[in-house]
C-alpha cells in the first residue's frame, strides 16, 4: 500500500488501496469553529494552517477500535519525529462524544495512553462537533447502550449510551485542504502497543488487535500520505 516515488525520490500519492486522494477545501466557517483542547485551551482547525494535519474521530469510552487508532497514531508520531518533521505535522483526535468527553476526561485519557504533548485531543460544543464532522463527511450517531451495560473506565459507573461512528483518518495539507481520506478499522497488530493501552482494550478490542480484518490499515501504511504531503520519505519506527 505504500505510495509511489518518482525518479527524484519524492514520495508520490498513496495507493488507492489505502484510501482516496481528494482535494476539498475546508471553509472558513468550519475552520474557525471553536474547539477545546484537553488542557482547556481554545483552538480550531484553522489554527494549524501551515502544518499537515492527520485528524481522526474517536471517543474516550470506546475500548475496541478507537484505542487501536490511537496506538497507530502514536507509532506514526514517533516516525514523523524521527524523520525531523515534528514541526510540520500534527496529529489530532476529535471526539464524536462531546457530552462526555470533557477536557478533564481527555486529560485522563492522555495520561492513560501516554500521548505526547504535541498530539491534540479535542472536544467542543455538541453543535460544533456535529457541524465539523458532517462537513468532513464522517458519520456518527448516539445509540442505546447494550445489556448488561458497560462500565465507565474513569468513574466506574454504568454507561447509559454508546456512539456508533465511522472510523476515518483525514489528511489536511498545509493550506488546510483535505487531500487524503482513509476509512476503515486500524490494524495495530504489528505496532508496539503500550502496555497501558493494551490493558485498556476490551475483550473485543484485544481480539481485533490479535486478529485484524484483512482490509484494515497499519501505521506504516498510514505514513504514506504524510510523506506525499510533506515531500519527505518517512521510515516506520523501528525499520
Predicted regions and their residues:
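N-terminal targeting signals for export/organelle localization
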Residues: 1-36, 219-239
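Short, small/polar residue-rich loop motifs at catalytic or cofactor-binding pockets
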Residues: 28-29, 52, 164-166
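Sec/Tat-exported extracytoplasmic proteins
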Residues: 52, 58-59, 77-84, 113-117, ...
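Thiol/selenol-based redox catalytic cores and closely related redox-interacting motifs
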Residues: 118-204, 208
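Extracytoplasmic/luminal low-complexity segments enriched in Pro/Gly and acidic/polar residues
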Residues: 190-239
